[in-house]
Amino acid sequence: MRILLVTPKNPPSFWTYDGILPTLGRRCIFPNLSMPTLAGLTGSEHEVMLCDENVQDVDFDVPADIVGVTGYIIHGERMRELLAGFRARGRFVVAGGPYASLCPDDLRGHADVIFEGEAEETWPRFLRDFETGSWQATYRTEDKPDLSASPMPRFDLLDVPKYHALTIQFARGCPFTCEFCDIIVMYGRRPRAKRVEQVMAEVRECHRLGASQVFIVDDNFIGNRKLAKELLRALADWGRANQYPLDFNTEVSLDVAQDDELLELFHAAHFTTIFIGIESPRKESLLETRKNQNTRGDLIENVRRVQSHGIQVQAGMIVGFDHDDALIFEEQLRFIQEARIPVSMTGLLQALPKTPLYERVLAEGRLVSESGGDQFVLSNIQPERMTRLELYRGYRWLVGELYDFHNYRRRTLDFLLARGSQIHGGMNVRRGDVGRLGRILFETLLRGGPRRAWFTLSLLGITALRRPSVLKEAVSFAIVHRAFHSYTRDLAGRLDAAISELELEGRPPGVAGTRLCPGVSD
């Protein structure tokens, strides 16, 4: 059989880096791992084709016996469009992934088959059923699959040069019980991991295909610390033997800061960046959302302990908790600045389907709407200690201040000058990237306007004078700022529209509205 597996285009967000990808010569920051994984689960007797809409146009006329579409909640509308387009051409269409697992009813009638849960057992079973004409409308995972039996994803089917990094997975599941999180709903609280030799084979394959960065997409890489340490030792040994050809990134919980051995292993394995869901500097908000692991010790001290091992902390931050009031926005900004966190993915609290938060606010009558999956534009919860208008106005101010030239430059310099050394002297830069980075800087200085020129020259100049060994990281941060600054300007426009709607809802007839939020600078 011929099988086409389609990944929808990502809408713009902090995660997509749309503002700089064209100048970097890339089409997407990294691939969704679902479809290469599914291709790896498909027998060699079948022909599998991958189509990632982030790097190529979708050809609805490709001859295929089965077309599979995956996606998150944020991809829901596009998933339905893709399914309809292929169905109109007589294709047999199936849907899976987080959106299908959390909101299967939204896709009924749009797909011939819906997959709920992980696919290691259900996908091969479906293929057998399809060949005999005995397929079911729904395939649901009953037991969590053993990842040690999972075959290698088909990385070879990806158009690797179009991605900034490749992705692999070590484990699924998380031991914590954060109220807003859908990870434990989908994958459970007991982390399940691949064998170390499986992961190392995937690392070698990514390196063979030309990757210079690998993002390990686990939602909590250290959910099982014993296994995580085993893998980190293997990665460190491999890196040492091969002159550290890959930068590694992943996601962890903040309790990593309490384990010196773990931090030393991350350093030895050449992890340059880790994403941590810090969520809030306010302890009451952390306790409310059951983020108890973030309440141990001082937050800023914990972040700096990670940074002291040469690792950049990217933060996930949220506003809109029940214990948040109108003061939280300045509190968030102050924390991010003092913690020296250059990159913060700051969003609005959302109640995702099937999560404990969703069930609670639904029971309390505070669920405003179903989640659209975009936490950077919408909160579907009625806040407790402020109005929705106050929440949106405050959030709009916060994201503008975060990526203001002065604020970003200050905390980035603070981080670069204080960060611990790295095992391999910083991030890997491909030979072709050196010239490209130079051209980007030249273009930035010529066409970015006087404020961007000042920002770039001062960031690089101070770094070169005070710590020249991290100059290439400073160049990277200067370029990345273009993406975030561009996105926050676009986000401000969408938030203004939402604010205007809320103002109209609460305004007496005939009363004009006023804009109370400071703007995002050009």
Question: What is each of the regions a protein language model found here?
Answer:
Residues P151-Q314, V319-F321, D325-R334, L362:
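Radical SAM [4Fe-4S] cluster-binding motif and immediate context
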